Amino acid sequence: KFFGLLEEAENWLQTCHLQGYAASHEPLGMAYLPTLSYEEMMEWSLPTRAQREYSKLTKEIKDSEFPQSYAKFVRGGFWRNFLAKYPESNWMQKRITDISDRYHSLVSQMKLVSPRVKSIQRYIWQAQCNCAYWHGVFGGLYLPHLREAIWERLITSEKEMETLVYPRSKLLFTQHRDIDRDEFLEVCMGNSIYNIFFSPRNGGSVIELDYKPSGVNYSNVLTRREEAYHNRIPDSPEKSAQSAAQSIHEEQTSKEAGLKDYLNFDWYRRMSLLDHFLHPDTTIEQFWRCKYGEQGDFINQPYEVKDTLGKGAKVVLHRTGSVWIKDKLVSVKVSKQLGIGVASTGIDISYIITPADVKDVEVWFGCEFNLHFSSADAQQNFFFIPDATSENKVEQKLGNLKETAEYGPVHAFGIRDGLRGLDLILTWDAPAKIWVFPIETVSSSEAGFERSYQGNCLLFHWKLNLTPHSLWEAKCNLSVRPTAA
């Protein structure tokens, strides 16, 4: 409409580009612009506690006798605070920055840049669409479909670059690099089908698991965090009667009743391959709410790492930590190994747990995966038990992805993402019980406060009796494949 009005006024209104105006007009003076955006954006970028304090301060200024012109000197945060506030955003941003750097390095070595190579640049630009990297009142980072689109372009751009450098049958690598620029090294492992990124300092966990053929990051799960506006959520879907909203930034509506019951906050980041030692009285509801007894010190603590690259790529992560057994602290060693080959269609995972003390101990061990799927509501998406003769076939259809449930013991467990046409299957040699529940956040959007599906938590767990000089071992294969017709 705006451009239409410009065209209608072309007989008296002359338009020009900034470049043309600068060439024909002298500057009025010099100015250095501050690193600012509009007032609300600078408030949203602050940490939760600081955001509430800032909101209180600005309200006091507005209600005070101070001249309102003074308010412009009160400033909130800095946009890049979003990258510190949300590690998932930072990881996404640093990944695409790294890919962009590698792309330009590759292009600088070419005498002629082909249309195919130029198309990679478009994917890189698309992956930098800003709305998925931050959050205010418009959903943003909390909207999974926005992050899915970013990851699809990001993974595709990287995959296309790899095909320029490596023949499909030759790609296999392990690397130690500080991807997220936090001064700690991550470990990367991959082939033409999968990318796996580990954080040794955060429980030896998997930060990113990519299935390259479809451009899917299965680790695209957002951790449940407290937001400054959570204390303003009304009890009913009706608009709050506290005050009339003056703008969309002040909306006080709730899209459904009972949202406060979903205000569960995680004390650790929702990654995968997290190693739990549960209190004997832990229930699935306590675990869902992240208010349970964690007896070990493995979840967010550092692991030592070793990797090898030969016919296959292997990464071994291990930690000797402590587990509370009743009123005593017992030393336990956890070692986990992941491996892939050049042509591997799956990822091999193995665990070895050994007691370091000379006494029998009983522990409840769990291995946690947090995985993102296209939808929790779609009927085409569900849990299932794979057929023993063909893992692509469903032997038993289980519940949908919105349910909280316990299954098992089972050797194999599958998640069908019918909207994507993909099955993710985990097969264990040691039958495991499984807790499953959706990871859902409560966030603000232009339509009001809402619940958003971020992914599913799968906890494979075993009750073990560990004896001196013995070990418990379990092997797993994780694979992603197109859904069988």
Locate predicted features.
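Active-site/ligand-binding surface loops and adjacent short beta/alpha elements
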Residues: 360-364, 370-437
